[in-house]
Curated annotation (Swiss-Prot):
This is Coatomer subunit gamma. The coatomer is a cytosolic protein complex that binds to dilysine motifs and reversibly associates with Golgi non-clathrin-coated vesicles, which further mediate biosynthetic protein transport from the ER, via the Golgi up to the trans Golgi network. Coatomer complex is required for budding from Golgi membranes, and is essential for the retrograde Golgi-to-ER transport of dilysine-tagged proteins. Required for limiting lipid storage in lipid droplets. Involved in the expansion of luminal extracellular matrices and apical membrane during tubulogenesis. HEAT repeats lie at residues 69-106, 292-329, 331-364, 365-401, 404-439, 476-513. It is a peripheral membrane protein. Expressed in ovary, testis, testis tip, young spermatocytes, germ cells and follicle cells. Up-regulated expression within centrally to posteriorly located germarial cysts and in migrating follicle cells. Widespread expression in imaginal disks including eye-antennal disk, wing disk, third leg and haltere disk. Keywords: Cytoplasm, Cytoplasmic vesicle, Endoplasmic reticulum, ER-Golgi transport, Golgi apparatus, Membrane, Protein transport, Repeat, Transport. It comes from the Eukaryota. It comes from Drosophila melanogaster. GO terms for biological process: branch fusion, open tracheal system; chitin-based embryonic cuticle biosynthetic process; endoplasmic reticulum to Golgi vesicle-mediated transport; extracellular matrix organization; intra-Golgi vesicle-mediated transport; intracellular protein transport; larval salivary gland morphogenesis; lumen formation, open tracheal system.
Length: 883
């Protein structure tokens, strides 16, 4: 028993109520670093040095920061320990090197010692030495150890081979060109009998070849013949096969004949349960499948639901839970098995079973299921509470009449203890219910008002206040919400107080009966100690005191949100230019609607890292375009389109195009990829065949396009003066100079090349490309305000022969026009024969657009389209786009 175990034992004996102690919890960095002097003693005391190294590693892993000097001194002292032959001490030294390698300076001094251990006869050293060596190796010295790495990849010792393969995978991110040369060794390791070596070898091979789609296809086709013995490797191969199927976008009628799908389906009969589950999970998550393809996979999941192993039950019910909304009919066949899991001893399994039943069950079973889940919801973790909330959200959409039961359950969950993510999911669900179900608005707002009375999360309080300001004025009794909002001004932090001031102003602007009271409350807010709160109160008071409805609409009710990144860019340009002129905020593009990205569950790599803030495509493009010479003269960017492919995915050269729309210009961005390893392209540019009225202003070529390196060329084109002629089709040809090169080095064999060209798909410029969608909080107010001389109107009636349902008609109109739907009018209620679609947006140059589309379903779909815009040409263009 060591010293720390003995002292802990004595403490427990003398203090039976005391918990287990942590011998390292009171360490001080300075004293521990001073102890590293012990490393210089001769002979080395392994026991003492191991203890000191443990302290250092503990401090680092607890977040203690070492400055470069401290880390370097500690690192160099640690190198003295290589003279000891103690195995445990040597392994601790390797760990210390890995931890300090990113902080200390001149770490390459231990390269020779690590290389010696890596190539030595002591197998206990070799694997750890490889990992430590690769943590300090940079691109400049990697070639010096390349020979040793190749030898280790094919080493007979499985631990050594795995260490080399995993380290190679890490090095591939920084030295991909060098690691690519190790493909032959990785291929040899793939034939190993060891399951982990085979798994890591496949991972490295895929990483090396993943940018070459043809090479990946060959690898998969070779391995699907049954040469893999490792279940881990087979699982990875299933994921790679799924990725190829998704990229090829094989239609359902051809998918069953695909060799890749046949392989995945055959894995349902594998002897390993892990592989069977992976195959079933992959099939149910594939697109373009039909019930016949899904049936075997769901049968497997149904079988796993009754397994005695908790892991299999959990995996099966979790997968069923995820696909319950995409394949409800198939999941319903498992309902009896899921009912049996409601009382499962594993609370996680029980939670997933109930939430799956909530998604697929009948309306009559909602109360029973909610009662069952309420008995143990307090016992499960926040992660699974979020799953419950998501199921309730889906249920509210499916059965809107059950909103009272579900809303009461959610409000009860809001009052319980929980973290930010958990509470956010509940608030998101309540907001979704309020927006989609008018009958639930009053109760939903009341529950949220009660929540912010005792809400510790600032971000949630601000969101709820924003919602109250948007929805509260149009409730049956708006005045009852004022007390909750003003309480925030008295009791909360400055950020929340500022949000409360804005919410009160919206009540004053939308409810004339409450205006006098709101003015009094805003007047009190002018005495607030925080600048932001005072400024907002003064700003809104001046607008409300003006008694001008148009100011209410433009600056309080329908505030247009600018893209903050582009607003900042425009302000900087203004300050660097003529500051004597007034800044025109109308030239700044409106913030685009950012849709949440749905993760693909079949992806090869997932990450639990925090998600970065969502940015619009325009904000992302603005930084890149800013590097182009003279781009500033085009003004602010209006919008950027999604990329479109101009070539097939398996051709010699792949090209995709992004259209960046400005006020009077369009910048075509062509992203080019050369997939031929024996060629290097120079002076790469795209030549456009322009329709009448368009003018090319600049072509910015790509100087060099090496193998497998994505590069970009730009073409700047000016729009014709007449908006009606801005819808056009462009011919496109990729032109370049070809030079033959060495596939291994990428160096051209001669300085001379020859001109060549490659035909691309035609490129279309549509109405939707030129419109930035906006979303009006209160469309009717904006529509009524547009009934003035400043706005112009165009109207026409159409028969939409290509669609058979109102929902298809709505989807088609929104897609063609590129407008943002308001008041959830993009969703057509079931069983209706009449519907009105309300849309809004901004045309390039700043012209606002409002559209009201009245649809009627009889033998076909009849459309009455009314367009209001601040520009007559734009209104007529929108109308003509439908015809």
């Amino acid at each position: 028993m060591n010293y720390f175990s003995l002292t802990s034992h004595k403490k427990h004996r003398g203090h039976p109520s005391a918990g287990p102690s942590n011998a390292y919890q009171n360490l001080e960095k300075t004293s521990v670093l001073q102890e590293t002097r012990t490393f210089n003693e001769t002979p080395v005391n392994p026991r003492k040095c191991i203890h000191i190294l443990t302290k250092i590693l503990y401090l680092i892993n607890q977040g203690e920061q070492l400055v470069a000097r401290e880390a370097t001194d500690c690192f160099f002292a640690m190198t003295k320990l290589f003279q000891s032959k103690d195995v445990v001490l040597r392994r601790m030294v390797y760990l210390g090197i890995k931890e300090l390698s990113s902080i200390a300076e001149d770490v390459i001094i231990v390269t020779s010692s690590l290389t010696k251990d890596m190539t030595g006869k002591e197998d206990l050293y070799r694997a750890a030495a490889i990992r430590a060596l690769c943590s300090i190796t940079d691109n400049t010295m990697l070639q010096a150890v390349e020979r040793y790495m190749k030898q280790c990849i094919v080493d007979k010792n499985a631990a050594v081979s795995c260490a080399a393969l995993v380290s190679s995978l890490r090095l591939a991110n920084t030295a991909g060109d060098v690691v690519k040369r190790w493909a032959n060794e990785a291929q040899e390791a793939l034939n190993s009998d060891n399951i982990m070596v085979q798994y890591h070898a496949l991972g490295l091979l895929y990483h090396i070849r993943k940018s070459d789609r043809l090479a990946v296809s060959k690898l998969v086709n070779k391995l699907t013949r049954g040469s893999l013995k490792s279940p881990y490797a087979v699982c990875m191969l299933i994921r790679i096969a799924c990725k190829l199927i998704e990229e090829e976008d094989i239609p359902s009628e051809e998918l069953s004949d695909s060799p890749l799908f046949t392989f995945i389906e055959s894995c349902l009969r594998h002897k390993s349960e892990m592989v069977i589950y992976e195959a079933a999970h992959a099939i149910v998550n594939l697109k373009n499948t039909n019930p016949r393809m899904l049936s075997p996979a769901f049968s497997i999941l149904q079988l796993f639901c009754s397994s005695p192993k908790a892991t299999l039950r959990f995996a099966a019910v979790r997968t069923l839970n995820k696909v319950a909304m995409t394949h409800p009919a198939a999941v319903t066949t498992c309902n009896l098995d899921l009912e049996g899991l409601i009382t499962d001893s594993n609370r996680s399994v029980a939670t997933l079973a109930i939430t799956t039943l909530l998604k697929t069950g009948a309306e009559s079973s909602v109360e029973r299921l909610m009662k069952q889940i309420s008995t143990f919801v307090a016992e499960i973790s926040d992660e699974f509470k979020v799953v419950v909330v998501q199921a309730i959200c889906a249920l509210c959409t499916k059965y809107p009449r059950k909103h009272t039961v579900l809303m009461n359950f959610l409000s009860g969950m809001l009052r319980e203890e929980g973290g930010l993510e958990y509470k956010t999911s509940i608030v998101d669900t309540i907001i979704t219910i309020i927006e989609e179900n008018a009958d639930a608005k009053e109760s939903g707002l009341s529950h949220l008002c009660e929540f912010i009375e005792d809400c510790e999360h600032v971000s949630l309080a601000v969101r709820i206040l924003h919602l109250l300001g948007k929805e509260g004025p149009f409730a049956a009794t708006p005045s009852k919400y004022i007390r909750f909002i003003y309480n925030r001004v008295i009791l909360e932090s400055p950020i929340v107080r500022a949000a409360a001031v804005t919410a009160m102003a919206q009540f004053g602007a939308s409810c004339p009966a409450l205006l006098s009271n709101i003015l009094v409350l805003l007047g009190r807010c002018q005495m607030d100690p925080d600048d932001e709160v005072r400024d907002r109160a003064t700003y809104y008071l001046s607008i409300l005191n003006s008694e001008r409805p148009e100011l209410y609409k433009n600056y309080i009710i329908e505030r247009e949100n600018c893209s903050l990144a582009l607003l900042e860019k425009s302000l900087v340009e203004h300050l660097n230019g003529d500051v004597d002129t007034r800044f025109d905020i109308s030239i700044v593009p409106k913030a685009a609607i950012v849709k949440p990205v749905i993760a693909n569950d079949v992806m090869l790599v997932t990450s639990s890292a925090p998600r970065p803030p969502k940015i619009t495509r325009e904000e992302e493009s603005a930084a890149r375009l800013a590097q182009l010479p003279g781009i500033q003269v085009l003004g602010p960017i209006h919008r950027s389109t999604a990329p479109i492919q101009l070539t097939e995915s398996e051709t010699e050269y792949t090209v995709q195009c992004i259209k960046h729309i400005f006020g009077q210009h369009v910048v075509f961005q062509f992203d080019c990829l050369n997939t031929l390893s024996d060629q290097i392209l120079e002076n790469v540019r795209v030549e456009l065949t322009l329709p009448e009225g368009f003018t090319t202003r600049a072509v910015i070529p790509c100087p060099k396009l090496p193998y497998n390196d994505l590069q970009t060329t730009f073409v700047i084109v000016e729009f014709p003066p007449d908006a009606a002629n801005s819808i056009a089709t462009f011919g496109a040809t990729l032109r370049f100079v070809v030079k033959d090169c060495d596939p291994n080095t990428g160096e051209p064999e001669s300085e001379e090349g020859y001109d060549d060209e490659y035909m691309l798909e035609d490129l279309e410029l549509t109405v939707a490309d030129q419109i930035q969608k906006t979303r009006k909080n209160n469309f009717q107010v904006s529509w009524d305000a547009a009934d003035s001389e400043e706005w112009l109107q165009a109207e026409d009636t159409f028969v939409l022969s290509a669609v058979t349902t109102l929902q298809d008609a709505v989807n088609t109109i929104v897609k063609i026009l590129g407008l943002g739907a308001a008041n959830l009018s993009e969703n057509v209620p079931e069983g209706t024969h009449l519907h009105t679609l309300l849309c809004s947006g901004t045309f390039r140059g700043g012209a606002e657009i409002l559209v009201r589309a009245k649809l009627a379903l009889s033998e076909g779909v009849t459309l009455n389209l009314t367009v209001r815009s601040t520009d007559q040409d734009v209104a007529e263009l929108i109308t003509a786009a439908i015809g």
